[in-house]
């Protein structure tokens, strides 16, 4: 996993347009950019600097609302809270890696998408289902858009 984030930082340091972040994440994790975008819509309403405070005392950071639970691991890999808040591309890549981890548990399924937000506890199955339904609605709308409109939205999201 350590090498993964070294590669991510290297990829982000090359002169790549921000709009390519979604496509980079898609290629790195084999997760559709539209699905990642649908999650970002739900998580932060496309606000890269969003901060969410949870009842359990944890905090969600950035465009993909990365939970502070992950910070110990991310800091070891050179990723800070500040980067998650200020660099939407890093947020997208980290979010995709977390979703990929959930897919290793649940397979490529809506249960995995729900676990992105609600975690893996058996007690949170209903929450996972409700969350996944919201993402499905966002995703369905994106899939119905023209390629031009979709590209415009993806570009705006990381340039805010």
Curated annotation (Swiss-Prot):
The keyword Hydrolase does not apply. Residues 1-19 form the signal peptide. The keyword Ion transport does not apply. Coiled coil: none annotated. InterPro entries: Lysozyme-like_dom_sf, Transglycosylase_SLT_dom_1. Keywords: Signal, Virulence. Belongs to the IagB/IpgF/P19 family. NCBIfam families: PRK15328.1. This is Invasion protein IagB. The gene is iagB.
